[in-house]
């Protein structure tokens, strides 16, 4: 039986990335909540771009 989690960085970025969060009102709410909480990484893509460099 195939497991449910089949990791793919492209899908991860496109579904949970920074641009995707900014696209909707609720996504922006998520980002502001994470900023208020002082999260080290706001979204998936912001942490991924740092690891690529």
Swiss-Prot record:
GO cellular component: ribonucleoprotein complex; ribosome
Keyword line: Ribonucleoprotein, Ribosomal protein
GO molecular function: structural constituent of ribosome
Renumbered residue ranges of the record's region Disordered: 1-53
Biased composition (Basic residues): 1-19, 26-40
Biased composition (Low complexity): 41-53
Biological process annotations from GO: translation
Ribonucleoprotein keyword on record: yes
Positions of disulphide bridges: none
PROSITE patterns the UniProt entry points to: RIBOSOMAL_L34
Family (UniProt): Belongs to the bacterial ribosomal protein bL34 family.
Name the UniProt record assigns to this protein: Large ribosomal subunit protein bL34
Organism listed in the record: Chlorobaculum tepidum (strain ATCC 49652 / DSM 12025 / NBRC 103806 / TLS) (Chlorobium tepidum)
Organism lineage: Bacteria, Pseudomonadati, Chlorobiota, Chlorobiia, Chlorobiales
